A protein has these predicted regions:
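Solvent-exposed alpha-helices and their adjacent loops that cap or buttress functional pockets
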Residues: 5, 27-30, 44, 56-60, ...
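Conserved beta-ketoacyl condensing-enzyme motif
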Residues: 1-43, 162
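Active-site-proximal alpha-helical scaffold in enzymes
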Residues: 39-66, 105, 145
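Structural signature of cysteine-dependent C-C bond-forming condensing enzymes
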Residues: 2-11, 58-68, 113, 157, ...
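Condensing-enzyme catalytic core mediating Claisen C-C bond formation in acyl metabolism
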Residues: 82-153, 157-163
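Glycine-rich anion/phosphate-binding loop at the beta-strand->alpha-helix junction
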Residues: 43, 58-72, 78-84, 89-90
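Acidic-glycine-rich active-site phosphate/pyrophosphate-binding loop
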Residues: 15-31, 70, 74-81, 109-125, ...
Length: 163
């Protein structure tokens, strides 16, 4: 954990795609770090980073961790059809990644942030934008309007332009 031990991480913001966040719960059980469990599908990484950065910035934690994991089969089971069903997938179907990522966030100026070259300077939280896409095989099409809206708000709110 970035050279830290469990006692140095005040809060863990983590989630996965399984019901009740079971992969997260079992994966971090032995760490005994206070957990804020998240369930946001593709947004879990951004959501956990946002919440952890707010906790650190507010002085609630000198050091917090953001963690996300995803598994292709879990998305199939939760949102489409279980793999055992053996349903035929259209060639244009979107796929869920199997992967995980973890980030340790620390307050600027803290000994934990020594040598860090990345800083969260602001966040833009998305909202539900529903154009009525109902095809579970094309989740990207369902998520695209909200993603576009969030990107637009990020650029507007922070006075930036697309490059």
């Amino acid at each position: 954990m970035a050279g830290l031990n469990e006692e140095q991480i005040r809060y863990l913001f983590a989630g996965d795609l399984l019901a009740q966040g079971i992969a997260t719960s079992y994966g971090i059980m032995e760490l005994q770090i206070p957990l804020f469990g998240l369930y946001g599908a593709c947004s879990t990484c951004g959501e956990s980073l946002s919440l952890a950065s707010m906790a650190v910035n507010a002085g609630c934690a000198e050091c917090a961790m953001a963690l996300t994991s995803s598994h292709f089969a879990s998305a199939e089971k939760e949102f489409r059809f279980p793999l055992e069903y053996a349903g035929q997938r259209p060639l244009s179907t979107t796929w869920t990644v199997t992967g995980s990522g973890a980030f340790v966030l620390a307050a600027a100026g803290s000994s934990y942030a020594e040598g860090a070259s990345v800083c969260i300077t602001g966040i833009t939280t998305g909202k539900v934008v529903d154009y009525g896409v109902k095809d579970s095989m094309h989740m990207g099409a369902a998520m695209a309007p909200a993603a576009a809206d969030t990107i637009y708000l990020q650029l507007r709110d922070f006075g930036r332009e697309a490059e």
